[in-house]
Structures are given as C-alpha cells and as structure tokens.
C-alpha cells in the first residue's frame, strides 16, 4: 500500500513543466495546450507551432493596468534581455555592453530630434499645412539612387519623417520603389527610394539581382531631381572603383530637364574632417551634377539644406498625394517594411534575401485596431528553422518589436500575425 500511495503522489509530477506556463505563453510564439485538449492533426500544426507569432499572446490588459493606478509604463531594455536568457536559454554575457550602446544611440537620436523640433519651431517659414488652392500648389518628384547600403532609405525616412523603406545594416534592404511624401506650405515633394545598384568591375550591372537593378536603372530619368548618394566613410576606408564608376555613369546619362545632386552620406562616421575636403575635391569637377551635399541620413546633418534646395526646385503643378491622410496602400507598405527591417536585424548571415515576404491579410476592426497577417516563405526547411529560432524565439522577437513600432507609427492597436512556411 505504501508503494501505491507513493506512486499516486509522484504521478502528477511527471507532467510538470520546467518553464513557467505563464512566461512561456507571454514570451513564446508557441500556443499552450492542456492534457484535456485533443492532439492536433498534421494540417493544424502549421497554426500551432513555434513558426507562428500572434501579437494577441503578448497583449497586456490595459483596463486592469489603469484600474490599478498605473499612470505610466516604463520599459527597460534589460527586461527583454533577461527574459531571452531565462526563457529561450540565450547567452546574455554581452547584454550590458549592448544596452549601453543602445542607450547611447537613443540619447543621441533624442537630442538630434529635439534640436530639429526646436529649429522647426524657430523657423518662421515652417507652418502647418492648410488648404492650398490647386492653382497655387507646387510639386517635385525626387529619385534617390546609389550603391547598395549607401543610406538611401535612412535619408528618405529622416526627411519625410515616416518610416517608408526598410532601414537595416544589411545590403540591398530596399527591394522595390517606395513613395515618401513631404508637404510644406504650398510645396509637396515626392521621394522615390530606388533599389540598390552596383556595377561589375567591367562597368556592367550585375545580373544576380536582376529585378532590383532593372527597377533602379529604368527609373533614372523619371524624376525632376535625381539624388545620387554614396557612403563617404566607406569610400575613405575601403575604396571601391565600382562606386565611382556608378556615379560617373549616372552623371553621363543625358537629360535636359532633370537636375542631379551628389550626396556624400554618413559624414558622421568620418573623424578627420580634412578627409571630407579631399573627397569633395575628388568629385568637384565631375560632369552631370548641379550640386554637392555632405549629409548624414541617420542623424540629419546637412538635410535641412538639402530639403531647402529641393523646395526651391518645385514647379507649379497640382499635388499628387493628400497631405492629411496616410493611404491604406502606404500603411500596408509601411507594415511590410517595418517587419522586414526587424527580419534583417535578427537574421544576420543567413539568406534573408531568399525569403519571400508577403502581406496575406489586412483588416481594420470595429474598434479601430488593425489586424495584419504576413507570411515568410523560405526555400528550405533549414532556413525556416533559422528564422523561427529556438522555441520560436527569433520570430517572436521580430514580431514583438515590429508590433511595438507599428503601434507607434499608426497610433492605434495592431494585431500582428507572422507565419513562417516552406515553399
């Protein structure tokens, strides 16, 4: 009888879970099941696996928080690192240095933003957009083109003020033309952020990224102003003759109506300012370019002068976009770009450009929130495993951060669903 009693006491312990069920549900993409639930069929596994991220699993009860008297919520990045370490068994030995670096970047960006806001407030010409008669409207189309990872997306995003194209440390993160719109007083400037272009040493475009190259080269003559941008820091540290050849080729394309501008980007990374003078002299007499600007697309240096120049080039022409509304098409595109940016940040050396990224569902719910469903389609199962991560940690992290950013951009609740499939 003693043996039977001992067995009965031990039996409940065999089904215990080492990780807290609450934490596992709150931070992992894997839905939880009880013993009473049925075993899923094979076709159901797609929706009940680590390969699915559903932001509703991560929502807090805002009503209860308000009732408890919580006035503000402060998020400490260290909490996320601790959770990753405890729940996903990730190494956090370098977390402290990462936090310091992240905090430093945030402080710098906050200071730069505050400075820009102050300058805008002191600028008498800077006024809210009101009703402008069609006959008084001015517009300008601007194409931004350059070598891969030259900073085209960061420049567009900073000037426009809304994330319109994926910004990441990886090369070729822009896969198609994206429209950004800046409306100031009676002038509207439409920016087209083109895919990264690169030439072989022979001067011929690469064929391995055919779609990106064809889209970029075919769009060169379509705009009123063409901005050719290159990474001046890389040009000084790791010179690439292909970049110079690209700049020369664009400048040699004949056009009577289009104005071309050469932007030396990422000047904030150059410590010796005399080096910038040398680069400026190198490209000073290059034919085909009307103006030269030294800028930082990430931190905003020189962009006020660039924006002023573009405003002066605007012509009498009705606006193409409504300055007061963000169209659904733009919102869909932003949702894809934000998720893609997070994907490129967390999937480092592993084939991000072979992954198909599709918007599968978009619905505005009665309460004003958005339900967004996106799918990642990988060529191989091994690539799917990389993207999903251990216990869904990678796709979960991508989903959490993308959902936070989309809520901030759209100023409403967002229900984001990410699913990883194999082609």
Curated annotation (Swiss-Prot):
Domain KH type-2 per the UniProt entry, residue ranges: 347-423
Region annotated G4, chain positions: 265-268
Pfam families: KH_2, MMR_HSR1
Residues reported in the UniProt entry to bind GTP: 146-153, 193-197, 265-268
Spans annotated as G1: 146-153
Residue ranges constituting the Era-type G domain according to the UniProt record: 138-316
GO molecular function: GTP binding; ribosomal small subunit binding; rRNA binding
GO BP field: ribosomal small subunit assembly
UniProt region (G3), positions on chain: 193-196
InterPro entries found in the cross-reference section: G_ERA_dom (IPR030388), GTP-bd (IPR006073), GTPase_Era-like (IPR005662), KH_dom-like_a/b (IPR015946), KH_dom_type_2 (IPR004044), KH_sf_prok-type (IPR009019), P-loop_NTPase (IPR027417), Small_GTP-bd (IPR005225)
Keywords associated with the record: GTP-binding, Nucleotide-binding, RNA-binding
Protein known as: GTP-binding protein ERG
Organism in which the protein naturally occurs: Antirrhinum majus
Record gene name: ERG
């Amino acid at each position: 009888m003693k043996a039977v009693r001992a067995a009965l006491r031990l039996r409940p312990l065999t089904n215990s879970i080492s990780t807290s069920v609450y934490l596992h549900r709150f931070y992992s993409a894997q839905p939880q099941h009880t013993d009473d639930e049925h075993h899923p069929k094979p076709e159901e596994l797609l929706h009940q696996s680590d390969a699915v991220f559903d932001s509703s699993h991560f929502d807090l009860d805002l009503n209860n928080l308000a009732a408890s008297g919580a006035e503000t919520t402060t998020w400490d990045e260290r909490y996320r690192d601790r959770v990753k370490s405890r729940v996903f068994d990730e190494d956090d030995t370098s977390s402290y240095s990462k936090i310091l670096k992240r905090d430093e970047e945030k402080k710098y960006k906050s200071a730069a933003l505050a400075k820009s806001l102050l300058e805008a407030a002191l600028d008498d010409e800077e006024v809210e957009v009101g009703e402008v008669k069609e006959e008084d409207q001015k517009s300008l189309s601007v194409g931004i083109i350059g070598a891969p990872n030259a900073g085209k997306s960061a420049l567009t995003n900073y000037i426009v003020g809304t994330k319109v194209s994926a910004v990441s440390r990886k090369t070729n993160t822009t896969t198609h033309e994206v429209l950004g719109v800046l409306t100031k007083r009676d002038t509207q400037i439409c920016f087209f952020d083109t895919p990264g272009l690169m030439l072989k040493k022979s001067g011929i475009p690469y064929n391995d990224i055919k779609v990106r190259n064809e889209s970029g080269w075919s769009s060169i003559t379509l705009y009123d102003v063409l901005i050719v941008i290159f990474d001046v820091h890389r040009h000084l540290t790791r010179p690439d003759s292909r970049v110079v050849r690209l700049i020369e080729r664009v400048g040699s394309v004949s056009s009577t109506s289009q104005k071309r501008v050469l932007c030396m980007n990422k000047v904030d990374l150059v410590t010796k300012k005399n080096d910038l003078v040398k680069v400026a002299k190198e490209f000073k007499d290059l034919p085909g370019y009307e103006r030269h600007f030294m800028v930082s697309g990430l931190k905003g240096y020189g962009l006020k002068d660039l924006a002023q120049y573009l405003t002066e080039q605007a012509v009498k022409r009705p606006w193409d976009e409504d300055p007061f509304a963000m169209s659904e098409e733009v919102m869909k595109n932003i949702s894809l770009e934000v998720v893609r940016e997070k994907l490129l940040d967390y999937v480092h050396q592993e084939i991000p450009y072979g992954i198909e990224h599709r918007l599968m569902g978009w619905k505005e719910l009665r309460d004003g929130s958005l339900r967004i469903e996106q799918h990642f389609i990988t060529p191989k199962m091994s690539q799917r495993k990389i993207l999903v991560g251990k216990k869904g940690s990678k796709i979960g992290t991508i989903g959490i951060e993308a959902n936070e950013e989309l809520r901030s951009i759209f100023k409403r609740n967002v229900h984001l669903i990410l699913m990883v499939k194999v082609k």
